[in-house]
């Protein structure tokens, strides 16, 4: 068993624009929110050990077993000492959209893992080159009925990305009483 100390960190900011601000005014929305979050994982000496990183063989602790059990679909590169990435979200809100009692909130989010591969599942799980984009819309009817629909596309990071073919659509409906 190998034990290494890990340092993780993140910094984020949220910007909320009101009706009279230029962004909502340009979009014709009532408000808009922009969220930025950047993070990192530092594990000194991680690249010196056969630590599994996130990826197709991430659940198999022995790198030789990972290569054998995944039929050679693996990468000999292990976790990196430093890995980092960022996330962005933008969502304008339209109260009483189209003259109805609905509030519509379209959104777009972006993920980009810039550098390094995080070790194991207990860290922030950065995978160098991974990108993800989501577009969606939320509908709120007088804070009683709510519905959401979104599509997520995951790409980048080549064969190291176990989720490259897992684009998905998500839908939900809820009622508050």
Name these PLM-found stretches:
Residues 164-177:
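Outer-membrane beta-barrel "beta-signal"
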Residues 34-38, 90, 106-108, 137, ...:
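Membrane-embedded beta-strand positions of outer-membrane beta-barrel proteins
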Residues 17, 38-44, 92-94, 110-116, ...:
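Transmembrane beta-strands of outer-membrane beta-barrel pores
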Residues 46-53, 116-125, 158-164:
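Outer-membrane beta-barrel translocator domains and adjoining extracellular loop/strand segments
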């Amino acid at each position: 068993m190998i034990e290494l100390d890990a340092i993780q960190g993140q910094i984020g900011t949220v910007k909320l624009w009101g009706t009279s601000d230029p962004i909502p005014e340009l979009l014709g929305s009532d408000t808009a929110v922009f969220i930025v979050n950047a993070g990192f994982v530092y594990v000194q000496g991680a690249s010196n050990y056969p630590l599994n990183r996130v990826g197709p063989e991430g659940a198999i602790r022995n790198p030789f077993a990972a290569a054998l059990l995944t039929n050679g679909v693996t990468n000999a590169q292990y976790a990196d000492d430093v890995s980092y990435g960022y996330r962005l979200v933008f969502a304008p809100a339209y109260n009483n959209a189209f003259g109805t009692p609905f509030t519509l909130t379209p959104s777009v989010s972006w993920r980009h893992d810039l550098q390094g591969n995080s070790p194991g599942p207990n860290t922030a799980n950065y995978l160098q080159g991974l990108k993800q984009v989501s577009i969606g819309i939320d509908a709120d009817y007088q804070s009683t009925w709510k519905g959401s629909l979104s599509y997520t596309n995951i790409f980048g990071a080549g064969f190291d990305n176990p989720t490259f073919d897992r684009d998905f659509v998500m839908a939900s409906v809820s009622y508050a009483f």
